[in-house]
Curated annotation (Swiss-Prot):
Species name: Nitrosomonas europaea (strain ATCC 19718 / CIP 103999 / KCTC 2705 / NBRC 14298)
Main location: cytoplasm
EC number(s) stated in the UniProt entry for this protein: 1.2.1.41
Family annotation (Pfam families): Aldedh
NCBIfam families linked to this entry: PRK00197.1 (NF001221), proA (TIGR00407)
GO CC, alphabetical: cytoplasm
Transmembrane segments: none
Protein name from the UniProt record: Gamma-glutamyl phosphate reductase
Localization per Swiss-Prot or TrEMBL: Cytoplasm
Length: 422
């Protein structure tokens, strides 16, 4: 059998097993799913030594290949990280089970009752890079939402992912659930991804987590729905009526709390009428923290340390201590800038004016829009969703942080008592 044919056959086998397991998991009650999650957490704690050994082998290989220190840092597991993985599974067990929940049940003039029931999606493929903890997180979320999961991690983490998956499958067996409810793609050949994302007969949704190149490839090639976001070009707009103290706190936190996250501010927009009072204050703080500032001519006229911005800077997701700064004439220009250069991820306004706050909420077309709050709040835990599988900037199905409910669908249910349509 040729290599390509073998990969196709292997992926088809994974898909068939996942589809069969999904039918069983979809019927599992909450107690059984929670039993499995707690058992997974226990197995991860019990097998800490073997997890660390598998990860050490991955890290050694990564160093030999000359991978960047940032990638190796994301790849590395520690005892603390393993404990956090286990705790994450226990937190998922503590979340409310969305499956079977009925909403909007109402009588129709015909006498029937019509409502909606929350149901699993089926089989979810998660494709991710570097971070082994995603293996446990994704497995736990998919299971709690009544789905089977096919996990394809980065080749640099293959041994870590296999070791974590073994713990996950131990937990599934403990609860009497099929171990094929969570499977890891064993091959590191990239052709496996191409096969996985086109298996519409077996896979119901794909969730890519990784760099822009990976996500663009999957979005372009997939034949099944994809939950994704390409960039996190997040803005904070400081309005004319902003409270300066609030504006300083929000802008500082949105940029400097963490530089490498998708909900970090990348562009600061400031109303011209408040710029002279606000911009020198916030720029002093940011420059002292080592943030490189790139601004338009008006911003540079107010603050000496700002470098000239070019057109590409307004589109940039830096994921680094770099910030674009622009002075705008009014809220309309700010909203136009966000519509032109933003990524529909998270954008915030700092204002004390109710009507302008409402305008910003209505007109900014992003998955999260905030008033007087840091963009760093765009997170499943912060929104009360519990763990999240990612953030979606798409408009169909899930949008924003994707928690358990985002991994489900709905079906209409109709209740009658011998009713017929006249």
């Amino acid at each position: 059998m040729e290599k390509t044919e073998k990969i196709q056959a292997d992926m088809q086998a994974l898909g068939r097993a996942a589809r069969a397991a999904a039918r069983i998991v979809a019927k599992a009650d909450t107690a059984v799913k929670n039993h499995a999650l707690i058992a997974m957490a226990r197995a991860i704690r019990c097998h800490e030594a073997s997890l660390l050994a598998a990860n050490a082998a991955d890290v050694a290989q990564a160093r030999n290949k000359g991978l960047e220190p940032a990638m190796i840092d994301r790849l590395t597991l520690t005892p603390k990280g393993i404990a956090s993985m286990a705790a994450g599974l226990e937190q998922i067990a503590a979340l409310s089970d969305p499956i079977g929940a009925v909403t909007d049940l109402d009588y129709r003039p015909s006498g029937i009752q019509v409502g909606r029931m929350r149901v699993p999606l089926g089989v979810i493929a998660i494709i991710y890079e570097a971070r082994p903890n995603v293996t446990a997180d994704a497995a736990g979320l998919c299971l709690k939402a009544g789905n089977a999961a096919i996990l394809r991690g980065g080749s640099e983490a293959i041994q870590s992912n296999q070791a974590i998956a073994a713990c996950v499958q131990e937990g599934l067996r403990s609860a009497g659930l099929p171990e094929h409810a969570v499977q890891v793609v064993e091959t590191t050949d990239r052709a496996a991804v191409g096969e996985l994302i086109t298996m519409s007969e077996y896979v119901d949704m794909v969730v890519p987590r990784g760099g822009k190149g990976l996500i663009e490839r999957i979005a372009n090639e997939a034949r099944v729905p994809v939950i994704k976001h390409l960039d996190g070009v997040c803005h904070v707009y400081v309005d004319l009526s902003a409270d300066l103290e609030k504006a300083v706190r929000v802008a500082d936190n949105a940029k400097t709390q963490r530089y490498g996250t998708c909900n970090t501010m990348e562009t600061l927009l400031v109303h011209a009428g408040i710029a002279e009072r606000f911009l020198p204050r916030i720029c002093k703080i940011l420059l002292e923290k080592g943030v490189e500032l790139r601004g338009d001519e008006a911003a540079r006229a107010l603050v000496a340390g700002i470098k000239p911005a070019v057109e590409e800077d307004w589109y940039a997701e830096y994921l680094a201590p770099v910030l674009s700064v622009r002075i705008v004439e009014d809220i309309d220009q700010a909203i136009t800038h966000i519509a032109t250069y933003g990524s529909q991820h998270t954008d915030a306004i700092v204002t004390e004016d109710y009507s302008r706050a409402r305008q910003f909420l209505r007109e900014v077309d992003s998955s999260s829009v905030m008033i007087n709050a840091s963009t760093r709040f765009a997170d499943g835990f912060e929104y009360g969703l519990g763990a999240e599988i990612g953030i979606s900037t798409d408009k169909l199905h899930a949008r924003g942080p994707v928690g358990l409910e985002g991994l489900t669908s709905q079906k209409f249910i109709v209740l009658g008592d011998g009713h017929i349509r006249e």
